[in-house]
Amino acid sequence: MTKEEGRTYFESLCEEEQSLQESQTHLLNILDILSVLADPRSSDDLLTESLKKLPDLHRELINSSIRLRYDKYQTREAQLLEDTKTGRDVAAGVQNPKSISEYYSTFEHLNRDTLRYINLLKRLSVDLAKQVEVSDPSVTVYEMDKWVPSEKLQGILEQYCAPDTDIRGVDAQIKNYLDQIKMARAKFGLENKYSLKERLSTLTKELNHWRKEWDDIEMLMFGDDAHSMKKMIQKIDSLKSEINAPSESYPVDKEGDIVLE
C-alpha cells in the first residue's frame, strides 16, 4: 500500500486544504505584482523588478494548481474508499454509466475551457496591446520603454476596478474592441491583396524595365563589348598613338609632311 492509498479521508482533506491555501498565497502574490504594474506611481526600477518576478510566480501558481487538482482527486478516492469500508453506497450515482459519461464530458469541457483561457491570456499580453498602439495612424513615434496602452483600451480595463461593474458587459466591450481591430486588419489585408496587388505588379514591371535599360546604358558606356564607348575611346587612343609614332621617327616640314631623304 502506497502513501497515497494509506491516507484517510480526513488526511486527504487536510492535504487538499493545504494545497488550496498554497494556491491562494501564490494567487495573492500575483495580484500584488499586477497592482504594482497597474499603479502609475510605480518607479521604473520597481516595474522592472515586478516583471522579472511575474514569470516565476506564474509558474508557482500553475504548479500549485496542479497539486491542488491532484489532491482533490486523492480526496475523492479516499472518500469512496472509506464509504466502501463503512458499507455506505453514496457513490451509487457515480457508478451509473450515464452519470459517468456526463462527468467525463463535463470534465473534458472544463479542461478545454481552461486551456482556452490560458491561451487567451497569452494572446491578450502586452505584445498584442503594442500591436494595437502601433496600428493607430495618429502615432508617429513609438518608444518601447515608454509604452502605455491605448486610451480606449485603458478606459475599458479600468471599468473592472469599479465595484458595481457588469463583468459580462466589460468582457463584451473588450471582445468588440478586438473584433474591430480584426476587421480593420482584414480590410487592409483585402486591400493589399486585391487593390494594391495590381499596382505593385505594374510598378515592379516598370522597375525591372528601367533597371534593364540602365544596365544596357552602363554596358554601352563602360562595358567590355567591342562596340562600347569605352572600347571605341581605347581604339581612338591607340590610333592616335600609331599616327603620332611616325612623326617622332622622321622629320617633317612646315606643313606637317614627312621629309624623304
UniProtKB/Swiss-Prot annotation:
Annotated localization: Nucleus
Source organism superkingdom: Eukaryota
Ranges in coiled-coil conformation: none
Keywords from the UniProt entry: Nucleus, Transcription, Transcription regulation
One Gene Ontology term of the molecular function aspect: nucleic acid binding
Pfam families on file: THP2 (PF09432)
InterPro entries the record matches: THO_cplx_su_Thp2
Any one GO biological process: stress granule assembly
Any one annotated GO CC term: transcription export complex
Other information: Present with 2840 molecules/cell in log phase SD medium.
Function text: Component the THO subcomplex of the TREX complex, which operates in coupling transcription elongation to mRNA export. The THO complex is recruited to transcribed genes and moves along the gene with the elongating polymerase during transcription. THO is important for stabilizing nascent RNA in the RNA polymerase II elongation complex by preventing formation of DNA:RNA hybrids behind the elongating polymerase.
Quaternary structure note: Component of the THO complex, which is composed of HPR1, MFT1, THO2 and THP2. Together with SUB2, TEX1 and YRA1, THO forms the transcription/export (TREX) complex. THO associates with DNA and RNA in vitro.
Listed name of the protein: THO complex subunit THP2
Species assigned in the record: Saccharomyces cerevisiae (strain ATCC 204508 / S288c)
Gene field: THP2
